[in-house]
């Protein structure tokens, strides 16, 4: 049964459709009235009593229990008639059930004291948002209705039309967990698990999102570009010296980009530079070299430090050398790590409140995971293959070992393996791990760790788009502009009242 036809006909599972609004054995006339019209129905107490708490109460001890004629003022006559039809076993067509019907149906079910799922996944066009406001006002304001308003509020809506207490509540729900992914040199946006929307093309899978500006930076037509996700406006940026961009990171404290690229020209250099997203130009060079390759850029969680590696490859494999460097944005000091590595470092990441590091490399024909704590390196895991590494809560290491995800804890104990959960990993704010690259899957990492410890079944679900070969999936907030407008408006009201 569909969502509209699964509450009723409890009375011995009989179908009384032929008796709806019929003189046959009818023992009560009910007149439904709303603000627009009136409808009279010939009904049967036993059917209404068996299927509806509202009528059960009505027929138990009140005057209506003995009256032949009863008048009921209802929110919407047409929908209330539909609900009574369902009590008689009449299935309703799903055709032409727009969002207005769904919300009014929910309100009428609530009026009749019937359980009904709130229609949370409603999409309303911008021109209909005021109608949505009116309907929510009729239903009442609660967590679900306010969340629905926040989900559908147009970014450019005139927020001065709304009371400040409602805006304060809306502010809690304006963060929309949308995500962007790159596939086949195209960039897609997905809102609320909807169909992926093609935004633009790109020459590189290296893209970067600046959350405070709600801008997406990418390379196209041999130039750096940015898209304003509020308006989908694209602007090209001339950076004449920038060649191949290897990576881009966002400093959330300043909204600047940290770009690692190879320069154009006669003297090709590897560079790390700061790009000002306001002035749209490079403002500072952190490091440049024509002798080394720059790899493994990573930012600390507080965005105060940048770590990267310098590597030099020669024809002699025994002379390979890689060094870790750390740049402090506050002091503008660049420090060289005291140790040199004879193997290539992979997935360098900060850990332990940004004081230490974790990484892996290939050594003695095996891949080995190391932590660097207080400048001392510790080998904590060894396996035949590692393709990616992520760390969770500074305590658990998630390894893509080719055929499975291996979870190990920093005390060197192996927690377990999850087969076919491979690719690169991203950890969401609600403790889900998404793997992407080969396929796209999701699991609740906190629950998984508990289940592994207790030998319980592990549940893996698909996530978002079912496409294979997704690159650079990350979360964005396409309502960031609206959130800032509400915050600024509420601050201005507060200043005025004070």
UniProtKB/Swiss-Prot annotation:
InterPro entries documented for this protein: BTB/POZ_dom (IPR000210), SKP1/BTB/POZ_sf (IPR011333)
PROSITE patterns associated with the record: BTB
Family indicated by similarity: Belongs to the mimivirus BTB/WD family.
UniProt-listed Pfam families: BTB
Residue ranges of every copy of the BTB domain listed in the record: 26-96
Cross-referenced Gene3D superfamilies: Potassium Channel Kv1.1, Chain A (3.30.710.10)
Protein name (record): Putative BTB/POZ domain-containing protein L67
């Amino acid at each position: 049964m569909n969502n509209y036809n699964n509450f009723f006909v409890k009375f011995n599972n009989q179908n009384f459709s032929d008796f709806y609004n019929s003189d046959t054995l009818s023992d009560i006339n009910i007149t439904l009235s709303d603000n627009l019209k009136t409808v009279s129905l010939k009904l049967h107490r036993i059917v209404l009593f068996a299927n509806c708490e509202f009528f059960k109460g009505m027929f138990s001890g009140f005057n209506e229990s003995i009256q032949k004629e009863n008048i009921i003022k209802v929110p919407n006559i047409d929908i209330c008639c539909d609900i009574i039809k369902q009590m008689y076993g009449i299935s309703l067509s799903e055709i032409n059930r727009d969002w207005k019907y769904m919300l009014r149906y929910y309100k009428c079910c609530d009026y009749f004291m019937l359980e009904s799922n709130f229609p949370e996944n409603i999409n309303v066009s911008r021109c209909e948002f005021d109608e949505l406001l009116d309907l929510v006002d009729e239903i009442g304001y609660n967590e679900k209705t306010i969340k629905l308003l926040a989900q559908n509020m147009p970014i450019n809506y005139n927020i001065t039309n709304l009371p400040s207490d409602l805006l304060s509540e809306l502010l809690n729900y304006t963060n929309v967990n949308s995500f962007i992914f790159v596939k086949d040199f195209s960039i897609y946006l997905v809102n609320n698990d909807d169909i992926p929307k093609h935004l633009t093309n790109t020459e590189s899978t290296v893209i970067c999102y600046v959350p405070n500006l709600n801008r997406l930076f990418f390379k196209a037509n041999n130039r750096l570009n940015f898209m304003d996700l509020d308006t989908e406006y694209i602007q090209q940026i001339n950076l004449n010296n920038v060649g191949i961009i290897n990576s881009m990171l966002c400093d959330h404290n300043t909204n600047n980009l940290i770009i690692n690229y190879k320069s154009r020209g006669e003297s090709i250099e590897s560079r790390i530079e700061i790009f000002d997203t306001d002035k749209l130009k490079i403002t500072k060079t952190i490091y440049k070299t024509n002798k080394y390759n720059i790899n493994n850029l990573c930012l600390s969680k507080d965005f105060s430090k940048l770590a990267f590696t310098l590597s030099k490859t020669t024809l002699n494999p025994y002379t390979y050398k890689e060094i870790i460097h750390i740049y402090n944005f506050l002091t503008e000091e660049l420090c060289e790590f005291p140790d040199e590595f004879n193997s290539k470092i992979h997935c360098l990441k900060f850990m332990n409140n940004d004081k230490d590091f974790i990484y892996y490399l290939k050594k003695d024909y095996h891949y080995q995971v190391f932590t660097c704590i207080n400048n001392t390196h510790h080998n904590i895991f060894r396996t035949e293959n590692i393709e990616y590494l992520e760390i969770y809560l500074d305590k658990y290491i998630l390894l893509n070992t080719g055929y499975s995800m291996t979870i190990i804890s920093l005390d060197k104990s192996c927690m377990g393996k999850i087969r076919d959960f491979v690719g690169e990993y991203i950890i969401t704010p609600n403790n889900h791990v998404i793997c992407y690259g080969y396929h796209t899957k999701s699991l609740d990492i906190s629950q998984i760790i508990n289940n592994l410890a207790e030998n319980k079944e592990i549940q893996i679900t698909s996530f978002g788009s079912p496409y294979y070969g997704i690159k650079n999936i990350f979360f964005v907030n396409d309502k960031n502009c609206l959130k800032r407008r509400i915050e600024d408006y509420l601050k201005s009201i507060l200043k005025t009242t004070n």
